[in-house]
């Protein structure tokens, strides 16, 4: 089994957390994000106060209100969730480019080759959790393990707002006690069948030969045999092509005016240029942009086609972006849109320069 360092990051009740962050009046009471009970709406997610009443994701809103009559259901704001997800992924990319998103609020990271914290996946996960909390004011749970299967289980082990680590030396003992219902790919039907066969834990499952499991479960029996031993060779796939590269910084003290923001630009641009220099040649930097998040979490992005990537161009963009809010700033970001050259052919100039 190859020794890798995989982190699974899962935001805690993500949609609900964003809503409670943006409207503190929602915190401390049962609330959910979902559709109207009058129109066969469904709960997308809910906070932990609502879960105490038995409310769950994918439950009909009508049934959720029967369980919890005081439940407040708010309409989803997907653009706000997408923006928060983009900010989280910006943090991820400081540590690795091997990121496999599973949804807006969940992703695998392969940090096997990361140089951060001398390659300590545990310290990287701790830093990610700290930065997300400081930057977005929401919590995430994380699991660290030698493979995806175990990392995902680990992230759920100490939810919410927890971190759990399974080291290579702990895999055999940890997996042996694991209920087979927790295995990746085991649904209710398979779990019921395993129970009828007297298989409750992975230790029981190890008593079955590979051939016997294949006879009983078909091709999935091969995977069951491996999972019972903590084996999962699936790679972290980063199939999506990037549309931009950027750096952001959340300041401990709000920047009070434009002059304070402009003073931070040189350091941000230096970090951006370092990141651009590490990119492969299949990307071409294009439009520059600036992002400003004000102290009240409102934000704006300003970009301009044809503008340069020099300090003065970014100063002008920042000035225009700041003018849209004119309030103290908690976060500044600078970046550039990318042209994806992979598989594309650059058009030759009709009259090349002499």
Swiss-Prot record:
The keyword Kinase does not apply. Mg(2+) binds at residues 10, 105. It holds the Pfam family IMS_C. It catalyses: DNA(n) + a 2'-deoxyribonucleoside 5'-triphosphate = DNA(n+1) + diphosphate. GO terms for molecular function: damaged DNA binding; DNA-directed DNA polymerase activity; magnesium ion binding. Binds 2 magnesium ions per subunit. One of its GO terms (biological process) is error-prone translesion synthesis. Its main location: cytoplasm. The keyword Repeat does not apply. GO terms for cellular component: cytosol. Monomer. Poorly processive, error-prone DNA polymerase involved in untargeted mutagenesis. Copies undamaged DNA at stalled replication forks, which arise in vivo from mismatched or misaligned primer ends. These misaligned primers can be extended by PolIV. Exhibits no 3'-5' exonuclease (proofreading) activity. May be involved in translesional synthesis, in conjunction with the beta clamp from PolIII. This is DNA polymerase IV. It comes from Pseudomonas putida (strain ATCC 700007 / DSM 6899 / JCM 31910 / BCRC 17059 / LMG 24140 / F1). The lineage of its organism: Bacteria, Pseudomonadati, Pseudomonadota, Gammaproteobacteria, Pseudomonadales.
